[in-house]
């Protein structure tokens, strides 16, 4: 049976990944807190854009507002719960999804920062998998519309890094990697913590500068003086 996937947080990253998983034929339900976004996707679909016309598509995955998630109790349990919310929302988002997990289901942290320990505190270490989206640069710029503002990584850059907290390569890590391989390049890592810290260091260099200047990350990278400041 096809694994049932629920994406908690259908914003830029969660919506992009969940939308493309839906495009690839996976059983995906999106969940989000923004009512206008939810209603727009229901009525018009989720519009995904990239750097080329070939990357543009409209998908129609099921989508729920947070207040509607209790409807899962009447449906098949969730095999993969993807948490793609801000770090400070991790605990309640995981707690909300825990009761709908299948007995062998697991939770994937598709987030910045290092939240696997927070998730494990709710569902246990054995039900946690990490997935890093590196240099994906996506933006939910209006309800129902998500764009990617950098080229696909392909052979030049591995975008998705899937890993277990204990570092071993498992069947479920391979399965998750196979799923996202249809979106962009992926690897199963044996060093999830190293990957997490590398991403955190990069975010630490750029996010504060972005907040102070009002510039998105891509514009910071293109500005010689600001880029040098970030590196220093």
Locations of regions flagged by a protein language model:
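N-terminal glycine-rich dinucleotide-binding loop that anchors FAD/FMN and/or NAD(P) in oxidoreductases
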Residues: 46-66, 203
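Rossmann-fold dinucleotide-binding core
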Residues: 76, 110-199, 204-205, 210
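Rossmann-like NAD(P)-binding element
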Residues: 57-103
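Conserved SAM-binding loop
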Residues: 30, 82, 109
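A short helix->loop->beta-strand "cap" motif at the edges of active sites that frequently abuts
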Residues: 102-106, 126
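Small-residue-rich helix-loop
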Residues: 222-232
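NAD(P)+-binding Rossmann beta1-loop-alpha1 motif at the extreme N-terminus of oxidoreductases
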Residues: 1-54
């Amino acid at each position: 049976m096809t694994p049932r996937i629920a994406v908690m947080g259908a914003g830029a990253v969660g919506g992009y990944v969940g939308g493309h998983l839906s495009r690839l034929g996976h059983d995906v339900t999106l969940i989000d807190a923004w009512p206008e976004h939810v209603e727009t996707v229901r009525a018009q679909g989720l519009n995904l854009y990239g750097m080329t016309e070939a990357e543009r598509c409209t998908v129609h995955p099921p989508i729920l507002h947070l207040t509607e998630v209790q409807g899962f109790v009447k449906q098949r349990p969730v095999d993969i719960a993807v948490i793609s919310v801000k770090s400070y929302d991790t605990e309640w988002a995981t707690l909300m999804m825990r009761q709908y997990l299948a007995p062998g289901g697991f939770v994937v942290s598709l987030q910045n920062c290092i939240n696997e320990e927070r998730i494990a505190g709710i569902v246990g270490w054995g039900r946690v998998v990490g997935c890093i989206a590196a240099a994906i640069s996506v933006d939910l710029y209006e309800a129902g519309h998500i764009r990617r503002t950098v080229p696909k990584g392909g052979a030049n850059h591995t975008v998705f890094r899937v890993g277990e907290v204990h570092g071993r390569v498992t069947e479920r890590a391979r399965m998750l990697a196979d799923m996202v391989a249809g979106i962009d390049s992926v690897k199963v890592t044996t060093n999830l913590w190293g990957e997490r810290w590398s991403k955190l260091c990069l975010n630490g260099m750029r996010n504060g500068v972005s907040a102070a200047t009002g510039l998105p990350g891509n514009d910071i990278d293109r500005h010689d003086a600001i880029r040098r400041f970030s590196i220093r």
